[in-house]
Design a protein with these regions (language model features):
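ABC ATPase nucleotide-binding domain signature region
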Residues: 30-35, 39, 45-99
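Conserved ABC ATPase signature
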Residues: 114-122
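A short, proline-enriched helix->beta-strand linker immediately N-terminal to the Walker B motif
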Residues: 130-138
Length: 143
């Protein structure tokens, strides 16, 4: 069992007087599957970015796991989809990608098209397939 520990987390954006988080404490067991629910603009994405170390904050965030984040930012969308997926999960074998594609009901031929030619739904499923193969990381899925 691994834990994500948050203690005394306080955060606001530069130039803002409004705190997004103030002295927040909690633990998350990485075996849990949980969702953050709230109205727009309430700090869900900000929290995920704090976990990923994207912003400076006060307090402590400790984790013994690495994080993977979705949506994954693809640098070169003109590459073949298979090449994009190999960058995300370089340790995975092609047969594992085929299996994930089958589970997500994506046609295998999608792998051999440029990523930019895929529909939004196909891009989402392809990226998730690769991220699901990175088994030792904790998935942060944002909208």
């Amino acid at each position: 069992m691994s834990l994500i520990n948050v203690a005394g987390l306080t955060f606001s954006y530069d130039g803002s007087f409004d705190l997004i988080f103030e002295d927040v404490d909690f633990q998350i067991d990485t075996d849990w599957k949980l969702g953050l629910i709230g109205r727009n603009g309430r700090g869900k994405t900000t929290f995920l970015n704090l976990l990923r170390g994207r912003y400076e904050y006060k307090g402590v965030i400790k984790s013994s796991v690495c994080f993977d984040y979705f949506p994954y930012d693809v640098d070169d969308k003109d590459k073949y989809t298979i090449d994009v997926l190999r960058e995300i999960a370089p340790e995975c074998m092609d047969w594992e990608l085929y299996r994930e594609f089958a589970l997500l009901k994506i046609d295998e031929e999608v792998m051999y098209r440029s990523f930019s030619s895929l529909s939004g739904g196909e891009q989402t499923k392809a990226l998730l397939a690769a991220l699901f193969l990175k088994q030792n990381n904790f998935m942060l899925i944002d909208e």
